């Protein structure tokens, strides 16, 4: 009997191969934390379709643990960093952004972050150098005959490995600062007149002053990106490939861009055919809760429950903040499930339970859930959108301020400032979102939009990877603008030529006019003299 089942599974896997073409070999250059959580879902689906997936992993890692999944093949290469060093860096990064950075404009706080961003760039550059300079490691990759490289664009190197292996590659990306990578490499347009820049904190229809702010942010990040790549990355790529090149030129060869967002969160803007928005690909129907959690949820009666989580990267909330939150939660009639890994606050109410981990998606999909208190991470926001749950946003770092600003603009959330938050601020926000049907109505509207797609985001992501493998690329979808220098892309040479033509025409017309004028004036004077 077991032999028949094994044969059936093998036949099923073979059928997947025939359905999508030949089973391929996918090489992956991933990133940590939520980046890995999202990309892993795509990789596991590829394995289910019969493809062989190999994940490149530095010896220093936080989330890239082979023990968590047996379906993926991991290849580890040595690095000079330790996992402890890496975790300390990310913890320091989160703490600086959460507690220290000014929040006035993107210019003020990003200047403070410059050293941290440079440190992250140096880490990525060192890891990349250690990977591509490892001859044994690169020879092994060459001999494996991979069909495609799937990389996270926020951590450069996957495209360099693809170039060295001479195979196509495609990107997964949530965002880059100021959308610089998407704009100048991916060819995605973000007109600052109506599209709020990431890290600007703006959303929706902008006023004149907000458009000025948005334009300044765009110009700043444009300049920042140029200096970011020109200082170290461009010389390294040129040296490695043995020819003059740039990071932007190599990244621009990406066949497809799979952006981990969607139009229920984003605001509309032009995109190219080789860009697809796959936000919420990790969302699934809610599963039954563990018995102890289900019993607690059911004990809430008609009032329902509130789910509270500020993510996996926040671990050292101050005692003062914890007490403010606990007191506010204690005042509402709902039961509260709070993901919190710290000392129990003295003000914690009997309606609130602390958990080091929560089945967040399953709780958000429970019919008794009334609201979700979130830091604004994209994964949590998409789970809330998926299940139609209104939010109280307490953004902490990175793009979370923008995510919550977008949800506020769409009427599905209320924002609370983490640094200045008082007991009454949080309590008022909770009562507003729970008691006002306006927020639930808009959350359900976004949920309807999210579910009403021709194909599921995960299926589209897998399709495009298989598409690139089947056709050895997708160059017919790439904009020809990738082949143009910046002055041609913006038609500055054409504008200059047309202006020159106008100028020459005007000059010739003036000269003709002056010639005619002088001719008749002289003739008239001559006639008078006679």
From Swiss-Prot:
Family recorded in the similarity comment: Belongs to the UDP-glycosyltransferase family.
PTM statement from Swiss-Prot or TrEMBL: N-glycosylated.
InterPro entries: UDP-glycosyltransferase, UDP_glucos_trans, UDP_glycos_trans_CS
Organism field: Rattus norvegicus
GO biological process terms, semicolon-separated: estrogen metabolic process; response to xenobiotic stimulus
EC number: 2.4.1.17
Chain's role: UDP-glucuronosyltransferase (UGT) that catalyzes phase II biotransformation reactions in which lipophilic substrates are conjugated with glucuronic acid to increase the metabolite's water solubility, thereby facilitating excretion into either the urine or bile. Essential for the elimination and detoxification of drugs, xenobiotics and endogenous compounds. Catalyzes the glucuronidation of endogenous steroid hormones such as androgens (testosterone, androsterone) and estrogens (estradiol, epiestradiol, estriol, catechol estrogens).
Enzymatic reactions: glucuronate acceptor + UDP-alpha-D-glucuronate = acceptor beta-D-glucuronoside + UDP + H(+); 17alpha-estradiol + UDP-alpha-D-glucuronate = 17alpha-estradiol 3-O-(beta-D-glucuronate) + UDP + H(+); 16alpha,17alpha-estriol + UDP-alpha-D-glucuronate = 16alpha,17alpha-estriol 3-O-(beta-D-glucuronate) + UDP + H(+); 17beta-hydroxy-5alpha-androstan-3-one + UDP-alpha-D-glucuronate = 5alpha-dihydrotestosterone 17-O-(beta-D-glucuronate) + UDP + H(+)
Tissue spec. comment: Liver. Lower levels seen in the kidney and testis.
Protein name: UDP-glucuronosyltransferase 2B15
């Amino acid at each position: 009997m077991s032999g028949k089942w094994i044969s059936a599974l093998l036949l099923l896997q073979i059928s997947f191969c025939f359905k999508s073409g030949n089973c391929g070999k996918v090489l992956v250059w991933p990133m940590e934390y939520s980046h890995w959580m999202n990309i892993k879902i795509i990789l596991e689906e590829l394995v289910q379709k019969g493809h062989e997936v190999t994940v490149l992993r530095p010896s220093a890692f936080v989330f890239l643990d082979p023990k968590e999944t047996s379906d993926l093949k991991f290849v580890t290469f040595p690095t000079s960093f330790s996992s402890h060093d890496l975790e300390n860096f990310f913890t320091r990064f989160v703490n600086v952004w959460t507690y220290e950075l000014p929040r006035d404009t993107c210019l003020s706080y990003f200047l403070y972050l410059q050293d941290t961003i440079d440190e992250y760039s140096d880490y990525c550059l060192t890891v990349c150098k250690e990977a591509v300079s490892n001859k044994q490691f690169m020879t092994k990759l060459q001999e494996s005959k991979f069909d495609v490289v799937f990389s996270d664009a926020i951590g450069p190197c996957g495209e360099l490995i693809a170039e060295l292996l001479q195979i196509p590659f495609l990107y997964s990306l949530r965002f880059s600062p100021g959308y610089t990578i998407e704009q100048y490499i991916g060819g995605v347009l973000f007109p600052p007149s109506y599209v709020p820049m990431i890290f600007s904190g703006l959303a929706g229809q902008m006023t004149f002053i907000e458009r000025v702010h948005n334009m300044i942010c765009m110009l700043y990040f444009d300049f920042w990106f140029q200096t970011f790549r020109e200082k170290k990355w461009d010389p390294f790529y040129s040296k490695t490939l043995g020819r003059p090149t740039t990071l932007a030129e190599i990244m621009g060869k990406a066949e497809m861009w799979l952006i981990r967002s969607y139009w229920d969160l984003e605001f509309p803007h032009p995109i190219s055919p080789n860009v697809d928005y796959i936000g919420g690909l990790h969302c699934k129907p809610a599963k039954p809760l563990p018995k102890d959690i289900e019993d607690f949820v059911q004990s809430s009666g008609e009032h329902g429950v509130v789910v509270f989580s500020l993510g996996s990267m926040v671990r050292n909330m101050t005692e003062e903040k914890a007490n403010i939150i606990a007191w506010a939660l204690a005042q509402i009639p709902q039961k509260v499930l709070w993901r919190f890994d710290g000392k129990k606050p003295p003000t914690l109410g009997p309606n609130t339970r602390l958990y080091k981990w929560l089945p967040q998606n399953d709780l958000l999909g429970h019919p008794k859930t009334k609201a979700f208190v979130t830091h604004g991470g994209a994964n949590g926001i998409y789970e809330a959108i998926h299940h139609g749950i209104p939010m109280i946003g307490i953004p902490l770092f990175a793009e979370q301020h923008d995510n919550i600003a977008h949800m506020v603009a769409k009427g599905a959330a209320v924002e609370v400032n983490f640094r200045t938050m008082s007991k009454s601020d949080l309590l008022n926000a909770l009562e507003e979102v729970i008691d006002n049907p306006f927020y639930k109505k808009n959350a359900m509207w976004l949920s309807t939009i999210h579910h009403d797609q021709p194909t599921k985001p995960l299926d589209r992501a897998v399709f495009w990877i298989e598409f690139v493998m089947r056709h050895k690329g997708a160059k017919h979808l790439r904009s020809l603008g990738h082949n143009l220098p910046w002055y041609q892309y913006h038609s500055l040479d054409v504008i200059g030529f047309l202006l020159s033509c106008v100028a020459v025409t005007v000059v010739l017309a003036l000269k003709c006019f002056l010639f005619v004028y002088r001719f008749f004036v002289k003739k008239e004077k001559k006639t008078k003299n006679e």
